[in-house]
């Protein structure tokens, strides 16, 4: 399994949207771990395409999004920040899995 770290900032929709607002509220998130096969992540599902974008969600509670699918490369990226995992801990886990 090939894993990569994407050190870029991307806007992800907020997990909870305020009512009465006519657009999707987002927040900038920096740093994502990516794999080609989304099933390499435990308990991750994906949303239907919205505005040409697909997002990854928790497979157990369906909270999210916790990441996104790159439409060009079809890589699946999750944010350690959204998973409450420290980037150093996640990086060590990825390194150990190589």
From Swiss-Prot:
One CC-aspect GO term: cytosol
UniProt entry keywords in alphabetical sequence: Guanine-nucleotide releasing factor, Protein transport, Transport
Entry function: Guanine-nucleotide-releasing protein that acts on members of the sec4/ypt1/rab subfamily.
GO molecular function terms attached to this record: guanyl-nucleotide exchange factor activity; zinc ion binding
Name of protein: Putative guanine nucleotide exchange factor MSS4 homolog
Annotated Acidic residues bias: 1-10
Family the entry assigns: Belongs to the DSS4/MSS4 family.
PANTHER family named in the record: GUANINE NUCLEOTIDE EXCHANGE FACTOR MSS4
UniProt-listed SUPFAM superfamilies: Mss4-like
Region (Disordered), start-end ranges: 1-25
Species annotation: Caenorhabditis elegans
Domain MSS4 per the UniProt entry, residue ranges: 1-86
GO-annotated biological processes: post-Golgi vesicle-mediated transport; protein transport; small GTPase-mediated signal transduction
């Amino acid at each position: 399994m090939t894993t990569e770290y994407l050190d870029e900032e991307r806007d992800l929709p907020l997990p909870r949207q305020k009512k009465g607002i006519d657009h999707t509220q987002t927040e900038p998130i920096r740093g994502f771990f990516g794999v080609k096969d989304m099933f390499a992540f435990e308990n991750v599902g994906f949303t239907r395409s919205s505005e040409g974008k697909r997002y990854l969600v928790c497979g157990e509670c369906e909270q999210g999004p916790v990441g996104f699918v790159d439409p060009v490369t079809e890589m699946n990226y999750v944010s350690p920040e959204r998973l409450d995992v420290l980037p150093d801990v996640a990086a060590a886990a990825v390194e150990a899995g190589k």
